[in-house]
């Protein structure tokens, strides 16, 4: 008798994706982050669903409804802090996942990589709109500043901004539509993640050595299913430590003040996971130039497959490229720090140098290092 999981139309799909999937025998903990991102997404959709039952997308009551959730709803405080910190956790996993892709050359699976970039844009849009919903000071001013960037687009800019706002400023219409989009986007992200997985399973996973592993594959279950469970348990332990002991560590105190269009906060800044891009935006004195640099800071990831010059796939045996990779990581930490600082010396020049270094490493130094390493290995 044939096994049901191999014949049933629905179970067959699950079987091919999570049970009998041939997987390289040597993939490390860095390959855990895909499943951890799936866990984060499920967590965010569930907590978000329960929050939406008590939240009201109205300028007069939004802030109060969040306070009501924290004070009067059973475990509302827990759901709210899980959702708020879940976003941070999502981005931590996302950045590790992208870093792994760059380090081990996974970007050479072009379809998977490009869908990943689209997913990154979708997650960033969702997080930005979610940050606006509590209608605190930083919510309101963050929404005003970021949406205003679109006015830099020539000719249609100001009309586009007013169209997005639904009026002449960020107001009730804006909050309402942001809530609608914030609710629907995670489901679109889930669908895109399935497409991401579909394309990955066309080629099979990469591995730390960056060599074909068809001669040495093992079934995903039980080996990697249990490895993912361990990763998930570690992630949840870390997550609940933050949620239960330091729930406000990653947030902005300004968001505990209700939105006031007449009072601008001294330092308008986004959540920590956008600070590197915000620093790149601010380091260019021209508005349109800044917006282009902001978009390119993420879109530059799409150029990785085109700029790959090495005859080896990953950075495992390439010390020059490894050094550049870790300088790039350090540079991103510097940009994140600068994004949270006021626009004054010496932060301006540090931000500008770090921004130039970011693009220089990716666009110029990585390809040159690849060619040098080929030469050194006489390939």
Curated annotation (Swiss-Prot):
The keyword Mitochondrion applies. One of its GO terms (cellular component) is mitochondrial inner membrane. Its cofactor is heme b. It is a multi-pass membrane protein. Its main location: mitochondrion. It is found in: Mitochondrion inner membrane. Heme 1 (or BL or b562) is low-potential and absorbs at about 562 nm, and heme 2 (or BH or b566) is high-potential and absorbs at about 566 nm. Belongs to the cytochrome b family. Component of the ubiquinol-cytochrome c reductase complex (complex III or cytochrome b-c1 complex) that is part of the mitochondrial respiratory chain. The b-c1 complex mediates electron transfer from ubiquinol to cytochrome c. Contributes to the generation of a proton gradient across the mitochondrial membrane that is then used for ATP synthesis. This is Cytochrome b. The gene is MT-CYB.
């Amino acid at each position: 008798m044939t096994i049901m999981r191999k014949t049933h139309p629905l179970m067959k799909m699950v079987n091919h994706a999570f049970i009998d999937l041939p997987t390289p025998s040597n993939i490390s903990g860095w390959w855990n982050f895909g499943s951890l991102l799936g866990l984060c997404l499920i967590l965010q959709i569930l907590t978000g669903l329960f929050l939406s039952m008590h939240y009201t997308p109205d300028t007069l009551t939004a802030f109060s409804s969040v306070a009501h959730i924290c004070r009067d709803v059973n475990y509302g405080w827990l759901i709210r802090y899980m959702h708020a910190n879940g976003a941070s956790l999502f981005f931590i996993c996302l950045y590790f996942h992208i870093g792994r892709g760059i380090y081990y050359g996974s970007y050479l699976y072009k379809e998977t990589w490009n869908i990943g970039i689209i997913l990154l844009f979708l997650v960033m849009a969702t997080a930005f709109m979610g940050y606006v919903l509590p209608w605190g000071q930083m919510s309101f001013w963050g929404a005003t500043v970021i949406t205003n960037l679109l006015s830099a687009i020539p000719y249609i800019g100001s009309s586009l901004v007013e169209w997005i706002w639904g009026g002449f400023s960020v107001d009730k219409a804006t909050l309402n539509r942001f809530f609608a989009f914030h609710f629907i986007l995670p489901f679109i992200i889930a669908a895109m993640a399935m497409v991401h997985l579909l394309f990955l399973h066309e080629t099979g996973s990469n591995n730390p050595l960056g060599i074909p592993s068809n001669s040495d594959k093992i079934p995903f279950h039980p080996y990697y299913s249990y490895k993912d469970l361990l990763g998930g348990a570690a992630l949840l332990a870390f997550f609940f430590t933050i949620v239960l002991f330091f729930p406000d560590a990653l947030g902005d105190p300004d968001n505990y003040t209700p939105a006031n269009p007449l009072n601008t906060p001294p330092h308008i800044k986004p959540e920590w996971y956008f600070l590197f891009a915000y620093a790149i935006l601010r380091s260019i004195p021209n508005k349109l130039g800044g917006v282009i640099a902001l978009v390119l800071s993420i879109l530059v990831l799409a150029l990785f497959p085109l700029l790959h010059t090495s005859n080896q796939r990953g950075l495992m045996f390439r010390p020059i490229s490894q050094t550049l990779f870790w300088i790039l990581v350090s540079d991103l930490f510097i940009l994140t720090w600068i994004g949270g600082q006021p626009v004054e010396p010496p932060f301006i020049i540090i931000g500008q140098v770090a921004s130039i270094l970011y693009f220089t490493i990716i666009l110029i130094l990585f390809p040159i290092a690849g060619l040098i390493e080929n030469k050194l290995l006489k390939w």
